[in-house]
Amino acid sequence: MDEVDDILINNQVVDDEEDDEEMLSGLENDSKQDLEGNDDGGEDEEDDDDDDEDDDDDEDEREDDDEQEDDDGEDDAARMDKTATPTNEHQHDEQKAAAAGAGGAGDSGDAVTKIGSEDVKLSDVDGGVGSREASSSTHEASANGEVYEYYKHMLNAAQIADSYNIYPTAAIPIQTHVNALAVSRGLKYLFLGGSDGYIRKYDLLNTLEGKLSLTILQKHSLAESIQNAGILQSYWENEIPQKKSEMKLSANKTDYEPKVSPVHSLEVQSECLFILSGLQNGGITMQGVRYMEGSIAHYFKGRNGHTQIVNILRLNGQEDRFLSGSWDKRLLEWDLQTGDIVNEFKKSRSELSSLEMRPLYSSVDVSGNVNSGKENENADDDMDSLFGDEDEDEKQDAGNEPVETGDGSNGEENKEQISEESLNIVYDESVFMTSGLNGSVHIWDRRMTQSPALSLERGAGVPPWCLSACWGVDGDHVYAGRRNACVEQFDLKMPSKPIHNLKLPSISGPVSCVKAMPNNKHLLCASRDNIRLYNVEIAVDASNSTTKSSKVPFLIVPGHHGGIISNLYLDPTSRFIISTSGNRGWQGNSTDTTLIYDIDLE
């Protein structure tokens, strides 16, 4: 064993000596290379510098990698802390208590917890979503408020204008009679109903902005100012609901042929949640617009519903009830919540042709109207409820709530003229007016459903015909278009006969539509040849023999010519007018064109 140990020790000594010799030889070689590098003039120094730069770059890359790993480590630690924080409720409560006791959570009083290496407010972590929702709702409310203020400003400007310059800018060619129109909130969509049985939806805003132009052939017969075309978005049938036994099924027994009715009336909810459409069989359909477009959600018919064409539909301000008029001489009020008839206004003596709610702020005196009512043999003996008699509140229908009548004595002074929710004109919904084909014009009170509150009889020599009637902006006057090219003006203070007769040129034909302008001085009168903007004051002076004026009482609005005007729509700000052409199921021809006009205030 001793010999073996001596051999191992000697081998170890020999190995150590060999290592020392190799080290000495390496040092000698290095010194020789240094001397040779100095003799070469520093050529190798440049190589060494390059090597040093490469080494520096490598070191920088390693440092960046180390920093990235440190950041990843911190992120992982933060995620682990965040994950661990909600799971350990006891530690979470201790952290909140410690943070609250240490610094009072800053000036704002919010508790602070430490997540990872950062101090975060618990209110920011827990309530971030709620704060974002609150800020978005606040922003939306402020935007709606700005639009509402703009609408009021434009309406006030239109009310004090001396005159209006009306000119057409857009046209929608439709090869059918357009009997009805409806416009959604903020002029977003335009709905047109035709005698071909289709409801068409147009993008009205982009149409007004001129996003689509008419073709050369379409411009050929139109005024030069008309350049824009209507942007059609969709269309669908005005379908009449059928029983399963009455359906005509196809060969595969899965499809059926729909029964389509001409569209005689339309009324859309302000947010386009639904649209009401009148049918030829006396029914009324509620159809989806924003959701399930064109599908029928409800069918208003019932045993006591209309039996003939429904040509009038009007939603109330709350959009929970609507009025319907028909060729069966009946005027009904429906509840959208239950789908039932809540009121029937009786003793309507003719097919209804138009219906309008009364404007706010009527200045009619109570005693003056009562006296005039006694002198009028054709009017009702009791007219007090029309002008706010409190004793009539007990006689109102059980389904109705008491409503202010709209005269100044009933506290209507503070009511805004435009609704902030729907951006539509606010009316006095307790009083409305209807016109009939026999020439009758009736004033109705919602609390008197047994008969009209007032009946405005036509003047001597006027034929029994009236397609359209409208209120004056003041709520005291009514204008009725007649067949013999004239418009009769009625005053509620003297309802027994018309106070003025505004005559149009005899060649103009019957007056098919009238619309009062917001300054209470001008009236739009649509007849077969043209649309005229009448100055009522000048027209009255011209008709008076003692104060006869040489001024022409009207201006011709360019665009329309040679057809029956079925509707005139004036937007709440009085910036635009929409006219449709159609005979509404009666006599007359159509121009097959819907025109959109711009209004400039003067």
From Swiss-Prot:
It is found in: Nucleus. The keyword Phosphoprotein applies. The modification Phosphothreonine is found at residue 85. GO terms for molecular function: TBP-class protein binding; transcription coregulator activity. Residues 14-23, 36-75, 378-395 have a biased composition (Acidic residues). Keywords: Nucleus, Phosphoprotein, Repeat, Transcription, Transcription regulation, WD repeat. Coiled coil: none annotated. GO terms for cellular component: nucleus; PeBoW complex; preribosome, large subunit precursor; SAGA complex. WD repeats lie at residues 173-212, 305-346, 415-454, 506-544, 560-600. The modification Phosphoserine is found at residues 108, 123, 131, 451. Residues 1-141, 366-418 are annotated as: Disordered. GO terms for biological process: chromatin organization; negative regulation of transcription by RNA polymerase II; positive regulation of transcription by RNA polymerase II; regulation of transcription by RNA polymerase II; ribosomal large subunit biogenesis. PROSITE patterns: WD_REPEATS_2, WD_REPEATS_REGION. It comes from the Eukaryota. Its main location: nucleus. Component of the transcription coactivator SAGA complex. SAGA acts as a general cofactor required for essentially all RNA polymerase II transcription. At the promoters, SAGA is required for transcription pre-initiation complex (PIC) recruitment. It influences RNA polymerase II transcriptional activity through different activities such as TBP interaction (via core/TAF module) and promoter selectivity, interaction with transcription activators (via Tra1/SPT module), and chromatin modification through histone acetylation (via HAT module) and deubiquitination (via DUB module). Belongs to the WD repeat SPT8 family. Present with 8430 molecules/cell in log phase SD medium. Component of the 1.8 MDa SAGA (Spt-Ada-Gcn5 acetyltransferase) complex, which is composed of 19 subunits TRA1, SPT7, TAF5, NGG1/ADA3, SGF73, SPT20/ADA5, SPT8, TAF12, TAF6, HFI1/ADA1, UBP8, GCN5, ADA2, SPT3, SGF29, TAF10, TAF9, SGF11 and SUS1. This is SAGA complex subunit SPT8. It comes from Saccharomyces cerevisiae (strain ATCC 204508 / S288c) (Baker's yeast).
